[in-house]
């Protein structure tokens, strides 16, 4: 009896020792961490970063010693990043396809569903609190202003249906992130529920085609997040 109990305790201890904690909403960070094989000094670019810890795809990497750029259109979110990750580059910007004044469909401070996309906003069950006019810029302009010399190992993009607008003004051939995770929203999908998604819907999307045409391979799909790896990183 005692021997059996001790074996059980040892099993529990080993299980706890090798337990991996995810900070992402859908465990995307565990997949990214696995892809990079525990790389300790990488560089990330997170557009639509929202919160520095909770439901965040880069916090696990940050804890491993990575650093990077976090961009969010909500100043209160960026204030949190400046507190939790003061050595990162934290930018309160609205990223889109051009420099312009656009409508922000605002639900509340720190809301994960604040969006520049009216169609996505109309699809949401929640009620828009306010429509604000904000100035947008592009990712290319932002990175050029930073005079970025770092190789982007990992890029995360989560901006509530506005992802393709960002890619329109982002030179993938120049910056060439090794790995990209991106939120996939198809408004033809019932209730935007991932259980109603399918592979055919993904490969027929403009998002998939754009990344595929820029030498990215689709390697994983978690809930509403798609993960792509650049051909050079694979080879």
Where are these regions (language model features)?
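Phosphate/nucleotide-binding beta-alpha loop and adjacent structural elements of enzyme active sites
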Residues: 1-235
């Amino acid at each position: 009896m005692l021997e059996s109990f001790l074996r059980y305790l040892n099993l529990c201890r080993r299980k706890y020792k090798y337990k991996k904690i995810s900070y992402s909403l859908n465990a995307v960070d565990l997949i990214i961490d696995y892809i990079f094989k525990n790389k300790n000094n990488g560089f990330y670019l997170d557009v639509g970063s929202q919160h520095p810890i909770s439901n965040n795809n880069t916090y696990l990497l940050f804890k491993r010693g990575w650093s990077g750029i976090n961009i969010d259109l909500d100043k209160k979110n960026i204030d949190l990043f400046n507190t939790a990750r003061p050595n990162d580059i934290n930018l309160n910007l609205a990223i889109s396809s051009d420099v312009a004044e656009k409508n922000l469909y605002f639900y509340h401070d720190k809301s994960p569903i604040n969006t520049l996309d009216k169609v996505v906003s109309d699809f949401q069950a929640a009620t828009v609190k306010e429509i604000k006019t904000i100035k947008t810029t592009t990712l290319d302009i932002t990175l050029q202003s930073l005079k970025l010399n770092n190789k982007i190992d990992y890029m995360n993009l989560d901006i509530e249906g506005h992802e393709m607008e960002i890619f329109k003004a982002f030179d993938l051939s120049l910056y060439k992130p090794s790995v990209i995770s991106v939120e996939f929203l198809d408004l033809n999908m019932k209730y935007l529920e991932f259980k109603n998604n399918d592979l055919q819907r993904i490969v027929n999307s403009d998002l998939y085609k754009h990344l595929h045409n820029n030498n990215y391979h689709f390697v994983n799909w978690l809930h509403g997040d798609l993960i792509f790896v650049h051909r050079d990183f694979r080879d």
